[in-house]
């Protein structure tokens, strides 16, 4: 879950957002705080807030989560939120309903421009996952920035299907 300052204050008041663990992409971190995601059908509890504070609110879930919540979010890249699902986030300190905020994150690769050239990466490419349970993922998008660390991003549904975990080399 990524939050704006207004949403953060609605949920956590004056609580401080602290770094628990740096993530692989420069400047991003797993925070010390958690929210609950609520819809008319169900709740998913204890979802970590990812820092830093953002310019937009974004809730990324899996298709499995979507079934539980009874919603049908689109598969999108981060920040492409128009027409996405509405969810309510709550904590012991507050709640907020976020319209056009919930997506299933598209499969993507973070890469520098040098990585993109070196590995001949292009948008909507195929990624071959060579593991104990191998397969091919189509339509993998490539995000480039000089600050990125070269890495494939999958959600837990995809990772579980290929029997891979965070940090595995594929």
Predicted regions and their residues:
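Short beta-strand-centered segments at strand-helix junctions
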Residues: 1-40, 45-92, 97-130, 138-169
């Amino acid at each position: 879950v990524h939050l704006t300052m207004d949403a953060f204050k609605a949920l956590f008041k004056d609580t401080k957002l602290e770094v628990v663990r740096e993530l692989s992409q420069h400047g991003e971190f797993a925070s010390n705080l958690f929210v609950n995601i609520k819809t008319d059908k169900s709740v998913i509890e204890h979802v970590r807030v990812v820092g830093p504070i953002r310019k937009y609110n974004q809730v990324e879930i899996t298709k499995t989560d979507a079934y539980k919540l009874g919603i049908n979010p689109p598969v999108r890249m981060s920040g492409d939120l128009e027409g996405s699902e509405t969810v309510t986030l709550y904590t012991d300190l507050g709640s907020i309903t976020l319209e056009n905020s919930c997506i299933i994150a598209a499969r993507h690769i973070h890469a520098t421009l040098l990585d993109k050239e070196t590995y001949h990466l292009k948008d909507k490419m195929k990624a071959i996952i060579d593991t104990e349970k191998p397969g091919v993922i189509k339509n993998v998008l490539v995000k480039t920035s000089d600050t990125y660390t070269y890495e494939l991003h999958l959600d837990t549904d995809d990772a579980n299907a290929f029997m891979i975990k965070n940090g595995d080399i594929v």
